[in-house]
Amino acid sequence: MRTLVIASGNAGKIREFQGLLQHLPLNVQAQPQGFDVEETGSTFAANARIKATAVAAMAGSWALADDSGLSVNALGGAPGVHSARYAPTDPERIEKLLGALSNASERHAQFCAALCVAAPDGSVLIEVEGRCDGWITTTPRGDGGFGYDPIFEVSCTGLTFAQMPLTEKKSHGHRGKAFALLEPQLQDLLSAEPR
């Protein structure tokens, strides 16, 4: 069975990917603790590629990397590729973002997820992107999810990601949409392998 290393130290992302990948014939593993890849790209896709190729080379197996983030219209697209580094912790990131929007009437935002699967030789096997439109709430709502999930209300649902069960988040969310594009390509790669 092919090993696929999730190129992330984020426990929430790892759990989400393990759930999304559970029905595929893959041995899904987290990247080794303490291995960190500097995200120097200017786009989500570039950062996903940087992480996937570095982790695949280090682990000697395929690696799946995600770079995702939140872009808020009223903030000129910020926090964008700096979403994870906008402040030190999830609660501080939420507080900082809500503070930046305290007087804003325009609260539209978009989550983007770029996924990349790379091989140990550095080749990129798959690259896809998924997006989800919504807006930033004035206060956190819900106990699920991670990151900005409690303050991102998904368009046409009335719910934040933190209020959604994983199945609903998968169908509406940026990562789920990206995964829907990635999954058939990953299945094709797996079925093309010699047995």
From Swiss-Prot:
PANTHER family: INOSINE TRIPHOSPHATE PYROPHOSPHATASE (PTHR11067:SF9), INOSINE TRIPHOSPHATE PYROPHOSPHATASE/HAM1 PROTEIN (PTHR11067). It comes from Parasynechococcus marenigrum (strain WH8102). Its EC number is 3.6.1.66. Its cofactor is Mg(2+). Pyrophosphatase that catalyzes the hydrolysis of nucleoside triphosphates to their monophosphate derivatives, with a high preference for the non-canonical purine nucleotides XTP (xanthosine triphosphate), dITP (deoxyinosine triphosphate) and ITP. Seems to function as a house-cleaning enzyme that removes non-canonical purine nucleotides from the nucleotide pool, thus preventing their incorporation into DNA/RNA and avoiding chromosomal lesions. Belongs to the HAM1 NTPase family. Binds 1 Mg(2+) ion per subunit. This is dITP/XTP pyrophosphatase. GO terms for biological process: nucleotide metabolic process; purine nucleoside triphosphate catabolic process. Mg(2+) binds at residues 38, 67. The keyword Nucleotide-binding applies. SUPFAM superfamilies: ITPase-like (SSF52972). It holds the Pfam family Ham1p_like. GO terms for molecular function: dITP diphosphatase activity; ITP diphosphatase activity; metal ion binding; nucleotide binding; ribonucleoside triphosphate phosphatase activity; XTP diphosphatase activity. The keyword Nucleus does not apply. Keywords: Hydrolase, Magnesium, Metal-binding, Nucleotide metabolism, Nucleotide-binding. Substrate binds at residues 8-13, 68, 146-149, 169, 174-175. The active site is at residue 67. Homodimer. GO terms for cellular component: cytosol.
